[in-house]
Amino acid sequence: MGTVEQKSTHTSPPTSPISRARSISGSIKSLFKPSSVQNSTPTVSPHESSPPLGNSDNLKKLVDTKRAELSSSRGAPPVNVNNVSNLSINTDVRPADDQPQVKSAKSPIIQTPKMAMNIVPQNIKSVLSSPRQSSSTNDRSSITSATSSVTSANDQKEKNYGSGNGSADDIPIAQLRLSEQDRAQDYTIDNALDTKDKSKPVKRNNSTSAFRGRKDKNFESSEYEIRSNSLSRIHSTPQNESPTVNNIHRGRPYSESISISSLKHIEQESKCILQVDNFKVFENGMHVHNLKIMPIVKSAQADAANDHDSNELNKQKSMFSLTSIFKSHKEDSGVDNSPLENLDNAVSLLPSIKNMAVYNRKRNISSSTAGTGGSDSDSIPDDLSERMVNPCAAIGAEELKLINTLSERINDAILCKSGKKSSHMLKEKDPDAMTFTQLYGKSMGVVLGHGAYGVVRLFSRNATERDPQYLQTYCNGQKMFFAVKELKPKSSEPKEKFSTRITSEFIIGHSLNHSEKKGGSKYSPNIIRVLDLLEISSGSFIEVLEFCPSGDLYNILTRKTKNGTALHPLEADCFMKQLLTGVQYMHSHGVAHCDLKPENILFHPNGLLKICDFGTSCVFQTAWEKNVHFQTGAVGSEPYVAPEEFIHDFNYDPRLVDCWSCGVVYCSMVLGHYLWKLAVKEKDPLYKAFYEEISSNKEFYVFEEMRHVNHEINRLRKISLYKIFQPNPDKRITIDQLLQSPWMKNTRCCIDYKTISS
């Protein structure tokens, strides 16, 4: 007969040392009552009085009778120690007559000797291991106790579950299915029971329980078959390991028996229990991403002079499009796409490398003096000497000075007559300064994408040990790669608008991902690095950005959709947590993105997520402002725009808009399509259906039908989604609250933010 698979839920009470049903707990305790019997021979405690001499014959007969009973009940040689697991028990002495017995068709009676560690017979395996086993009579073992206290009402529940009749909610969450080899070697209680959540009982709603009770064969055989057990930590005992005291796994801290937490804990590499495309999950709950790298990057390691390779590059360059930074526009047809020339004459608009240390020091001084009202005359002008109330804001005194400097230089370059150099470019260059080619390399002849103001090209150069630390971008060990974005004003656009847009976009990106600490917080790894802004000719500029070789989320979802799949729920949860963490960092620095969508989310091969494109970002709070500035008017891409943005003359909080957009992005990851095209009831029937269901039933069928490998996390996720998609922004959850929700708290992320922030 095939195995009966069951779903599992964690229901361990905080007061019980074992997470399973009370019947097993009682059985184990009765099986291993402290004993004074050793080697099946009863002994007399030294504290007991000797029997009268006159009764010696009766005593001898009694001993012989007991020996005969024990010998007949065994019927098999003693169990080898190598075939059992060890448990920690009490060491009190009790009479031999109260010895519990274990009866089985395959195993003899085991009487526990007087020792700190007792032995579990192999026939307990069927009870301690996963209940998803064959119910064959020959493979089943029974447990019989000498006392009547062993039997309880929960015994029947456990028996029903073992036969496939019990409720799934009675079983611990995250219980892994072990292979036949694992079952033969790993049946200790510590390994058979869940160890992740020891104290919190799980309470499920009716809809979730009903869903779990369905026997959906298609779902059982799907790629999500792993369920909640992918998140538990279970270490299997090696085959060559004898179950001695030193080899016992670490016990649970609330165990009522002898503590073994101080004993040696055997670390074993977790095995992969799920592999879906470029995503792996291990039995300890950890996971790894291995996203595809753009073919152009792989080909860069080969000989670039080979004609065959060059032809292949030209064919493959359109497979990925970094539309996250470089959005497609109708006006692109009027943009000059000719190759960039004379880049070695480009002049950076940023402070020189020599002055960067001074710039960083002034930033820290301005932050440290914010609480005292003090000011530094060299860093903060007189009109900005008032006390700063928000030292963590991305836009402070130094950023304001840099904005003024960049605006002046950009306007000077734009207004300069054709063929003439701006005053900034006429200045004598520092002879020690590195040229553009030395810093960022040469063009690889590949256009990554098209933007509103020009094209984006891929540049690369050989990596060296002397590379500046601030040039943090993708490196494959041989070459460093950079994305170079060209910025040219369109003939139909006012020069002031062009200057304001590129200045604000660069300043926001540059200040957000600055490597130095500001206001006690370190840079976020989920914000793309803006490395440089240079003037290359009269009215033309280039922006150098960190290169992400795995493309954007839009292309990842597009490839998945072509295969008829979507992101795995655990993978989507990890990306969602990274996205929320990056947005939280922006909000804590007074900046809202206002255009979050898959095209604006980039990836590195290891799954590191990067938020980019700050062209429409909103600075809602500077260093001198206590209150948040609200916005009016719709900003961003329609499927991801919150409903309040379409209300005429409505002042909305840009932070809550970002939260709505994050929710739409997540649903796109797990569903593979948009929820709706426009969040307006009168214009989109899909959104109208959502609004009516939420208003009348407080439910949305799309959220109710979403699946997850872990049913408890699925329930928590559903609660969070309902809080995100509140049409009324006053009732909507914030990014900070969402990151503190049970859903995100129970979401494993591949990024260790504690290490980064330390």
UniProtKB/Swiss-Prot annotation:
Residues 58-69, 216-226 have a biased composition (Basic and acidic residues). PROSITE patterns: PROTEIN_KINASE_DOM (PS50011), PROTEIN_KINASE_ST (PS00108). Gene3D superfamilies: Transferase(Phosphotransferase) domain 1 (1.10.510.10). Keywords: ATP-binding, Kinase, Nucleotide-binding, Serine/threonine-protein kinase, Transferase. GO terms for cellular component: cytosol. InterPro entries: Kinase-like_dom_sf, Prot_kinase_dom, Ser/Thr_kinase_AS. The keyword Transferase applies. Residues 129-153 have a biased composition (Low complexity). It catalyses: L-seryl-[protein] + ATP = O-phospho-L-seryl-[protein] + ADP + H(+); L-threonyl-[protein] + ATP = O-phospho-L-threonyl-[protein] + ADP + H(+). ATP binds at L448, G449, H450, G451, A452, Y453, G454, V455, V456, K485. Disulfide bonds: none annotated. It is an enzyme of class 2 (transferase). SMART domains: S_TKc. Its EC number is 2.7.11.1. GO terms for biological process: intracellular monoatomic cation homeostasis. Belongs to the protein kinase superfamily. CAMK Ser/Thr protein kinase family. NPR/HAL subfamily. HAL5 sub-subfamily. This is Probable serine/threonine-protein kinase HAL5-like. It comes from Vanderwaltozyma polyspora (strain ATCC 22028 / DSM 70294 / BCRC 21397 / CBS 2163 / NBRC 10782 / NRRL Y-8283 / UCD 57-17) (Kluyveromyces polysporus).
